[in-house]
Regions:
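A conserved, positively charged/aromatic
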Residues: 69, 97-125, 137
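Short hydrophobic beta-strand element within catalytic cores of glycosyltransferases
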Residues: 36-37, 269-272, 282
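Nucleotide-activated donor-binding/catalytic signature segment of Leloir-type glycosyltransferases, i.e.
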Residues: 217-232
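Aromatic "clamp/platform" in nucleotide-sugar-dependent glycosyltransferases that forms part
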Residues: 233, 252
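Short His-centered aromatic/hydrophobic patch
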Residues: 77-83, 104
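Donor nucleotide-sugar binding/catalytic pocket of nucleotide-sugar-dependent glycosyltransferases
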Residues: 55, 119-157
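Conserved acidic donor-binding segment of nucleotide-sugar-dependent glycosyltransferases
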Residues: 284-285, 289-296, 305-311, 325
């Protein structure tokens, strides 16, 4: 089977990591792959290391040649700009395409977006919430739920030891997310204010950068907090997962929350908000704790509960390990294979 994966993002974040993971697994299973990517993205350097055809396209209107997809069975779209590339390529050369949608925002009611989604042979959402949002806009389309799979990271014990020394004798809570409004960092800071008076040994480390950083830093100064540290974007997440005691993810909206899966895979207990696709991952009191979005008191209470209750921590770690089996890359790759094959079967019957 020959699949053309398209991801035109200029950066490299969760969606690109998940695309790369699927590509890597499919190569192991014997797929032939073509990848269309943005030359500005770090994603390209990773693809060049793999045994697949790479096409560089700086815009969805670029690189439309029959030779790119003439041997491909399906075009697989992985982000918002890529869908328009797939629409053009499909219209010109007749190759069907599917779309994986990773965010839980309502689909835009714009003519080009509607055309692009309407012409897709199948649509995929990572979570129940995303599937629901797709159905609202395109109720007649074939829609599948296929979650992303957790990425595993290497661990350098020397780096872990350095983190431990920096936060010695503290219960280390990490939030690993870009500093964007919907990621809920303001709720984290508000919770830190409550925790500072409650337990001086709990420390919150914010791993990520973004437009909200200055605002959040000012809030920390205003509250005179000594239990919050801004550490910027971190490239060695495996070391942080190994060093931390708890991961929190109090987003106001979230497609799925792949960082939660990554933390579970690293045997870290997790707390997340009851928003978007996060409840698809966290079964409250079993594989993690759920709190309502924007509720700083509930978040502070949950953090304190995990910090002070070792049996609960162990229970959540065990539950997390059991939960991630449902998100294993071999399993999710098999689900995509079923989608591809159904498209080929229907095409043969026409």
């Amino acid at each position: 089977m020959h699949i053309c994966h398209v991801n035109l993002a200029s950066g490299f974040s969760g969606g690109e990591r998940q695309t790369l993971q699927l590509i890597t697994r499919q190569l192991k299973e014997g797929y032939q792959l073509t990848v269309v990517a943005n030359p500005k993205s770090p994603f390209v350097a990773d693809i060049k290391k793999l045994n697949c055809k790479l096409v560089l396209a700086s815009h969805f209107s670029k690189q439309h040649k029959k030779s790119i997809t003439e041997h491909c069975d399906v075009i697989h779209v992985h982000e918002g700009r890529a869908i328009y590339w797939a629409l053009i390529q499909s219209k010109r050369f007749g190759v069907p395409y599917i779309v994986t949608r990773r965010i839980d925002n309502p689909l835009k009611d714009k003519w080009l977006s509607n055309i692009a989604y309407s012409n897709a042979t199948a649509l995929v959402g990572l979570s129940n919430e995303i599937v629901s949002k797709i159905k609202e806009r395109h109720p007649d389309k074939v829609i599948y739920k296929i979650p992303s799979s957790p990425v595993s990271y290497s661990v350098e014990q020397e780096n872990v030891d350095t983190i431990w020394r920096r936060f010695s004798n503290q219960f280390l809570v990490i939030q690993a997310a870009n500093l964007l409004h919907h990621k809920g960092h303001q709720t984290t800071v508000e919770a830190a204010k409550l925790l500072q008076d409650l337990d001086s040994n709990i420390h919150l480390a914010l791993l990520g950068d973004g437009p909200e950083r200055e605002k959040l830093e000012n809030l920390v100064k205003e509250y005179d907090l000594h239990n919050v540290t801004f550490l910027g974007k971190q490239n060695r997440m495996g070391d942080w997962f190994a060093a931390a005691d708890l991961l929190i993810h109090p987003s106001y909206s979230e497609g799925l929350g792949s960082v939660i899966l990554e933390a579970m895979g690293a045997k870290l207990p997790v707390i997340g908000s009851n928003a978007g696709g996060i409840p698809d991952i966290i079964d409250d009191q079993e594989s993690g704790l759920l709190v309502e979005a924007r509720d700083a008191q509930a978040l502070a209470d949950a953090i304190y509960q995990v910090a002070t209750d070792k049996p609960l921590r162990n229970k959540l770690i065990t539950g997390g390990q059991e939960k991630i089996a449902m998100f294993d890359i071999k399993y999710t790759t098999s689900l995509y294979k079923d989608v591809y094959q159904s498209i080929l079967l229907n095409g043969d019957e026409k």
